[in-house]
Amino acid sequence: MKLVNVQEMKQLDQLATAEYAVPGILLMDNAAQAVADAVNDSLDELDGESVVVFCGGGNNGGDGFGAARWLQNYGARVRVFVVGKALDAVTGDAAAELAMLQKTDAKVEAIVGEDDWVVAELAAAKADILVDALAGTGFHGEPEGDLLRACRLMNDSEKYIVAVDVPTCVNADNGAVAENAVRADKTVTMALLKTGLLLYPGREYCGDIELADIGMPAKMVEECASKKYRLTDDIVRELLPLRKADAHKGDAGRAVICAGSPGFTGAAALSSYAAVKAGAGLVALYTPLSSRDVLAGKLTEVMVHGLLERMPGILGGGATGDVVKNANAADVLAIGPGLGTSESTQQVVRDILLQLQVPVVIDADALTALQGHTEILTQMQAAKVLTPHPGEMARLIGKEISEINADRINIAAQYAQEWNAVLVLKGAPTVIACPDGTVYVNSTGSSALATGGSGDVLTGIIAGLAAQEITLQEAAVCGVYLHGKAADISGIDIGLAAGELAQFLPEARCEVLKGN
């Protein structure tokens, strides 16, 4: 499903009218009917129910005027309050919708003084449902004056709120919210999903999100310049590797994992086990010699090999050749989980990356090895995927975590292209950015994934999929989606252990392939 930012949506609106001869009033009225239908669906029936619509003076308000007219036709008792503008000051398509509304029995009044606010507050208190049509995707910053008061009125009402396109004062680009942004129970967004509706904290203010088809020409939407997508079963189904009926373990691919150290054997075990559960035919784990026996006892399906150490848990230079030789004979390498952050080990990691010729998943301690050495990423011959959480990403690029979370999509896209890497920026939601500028926003998973080892499982999933004759980019997209879907189908909200998560992977894969 394609995603757009505010500027891209504005360009589509203009293109629909200028190049495809679609009247703006037609698009507005289709949007209005979609909002009215959403209100209707939110109530058992509209016959005699009270709906109060708060409208601004722009196009978002125009959608509200039209929705009020449709609701009146559906049998609701409708009252409309125009905030921040006199009725005769409304212009454009919104004025046309207002004129049609005024021909109905709906009450329409502008809030121009304190007495009007008292009336509006009383009406909202008696309403069954409120509609937020105050300000659309173009609004940024903090609300002031009448707009601020209207936002507070709706939030304080404790009524069910349906927002038009985006809740007022939620940034439709990056999900930032003003202090008094409207908290909607349902958001009806028009034509295409806006990125800010999927990013926190804005996502929390949207409630249920409905995408409305308002009659945008399909050809125009398909040719939209945006390369941003929300992941769905349909997208992932086309990318997942399939297995022939007569396949043997060699056909299913070989994954090498370089991970673990004393005290951190769990990370190595989880990533290795996840690679198996993701479908890799053969998985070999290379770990410091002092961790080998512990991990061999934990992993019955994985071949465990010890690496030369300078001292227990600290890799020496001799480990480099062993990992490179065996990884280059396989289909993919995953490196980093629990490997350790000693300078000697970190240098081994850097040397491995520079000598590697097969695709590699770089995570955890291997990302730490790249701090201050990101030039290695552009020097590498191998295709690569990086899987940082916001803290790791912040350290890699010298920014604050808050800066990363405030601009997840753009930052991920920038560095994926700069480093010529697939960048999996973990979080809510996880963003997958590709070197060609394509960005995917994940739609699966929940806070159930907020548990130690979850990231190690993701690393193993991506490696296990990449071993099966799909590209690293495809493996990252599928891996992130299946990782979240496994958590979803577990039915566990709190207390989902990372090892349990991996056990749901085959079921998650089957659900995607079957279209469930």
Each language-model region and where it sits:
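Short acidic loop-to-helix transition motifs that present clustered carboxylates
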Residues: 113-117, 166-172, 195, 367-370
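Small-residue (G/A/S/T)-rich helix-start motifs and N-terminal tracts that mark the onset
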Residues: 1-84, 91, 95, 197-360, ...
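Nucleotide and nucleotide-moiety/phosphate-recognizing core
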Residues: 37-134, 142-164
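Glycine-rich phosphate-binding loop
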Residues: 118, 125-142, 333-340, 417, ...
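Internal gly/pro-rich beta-alpha loop/helix module
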Residues: 124-129, 134-226
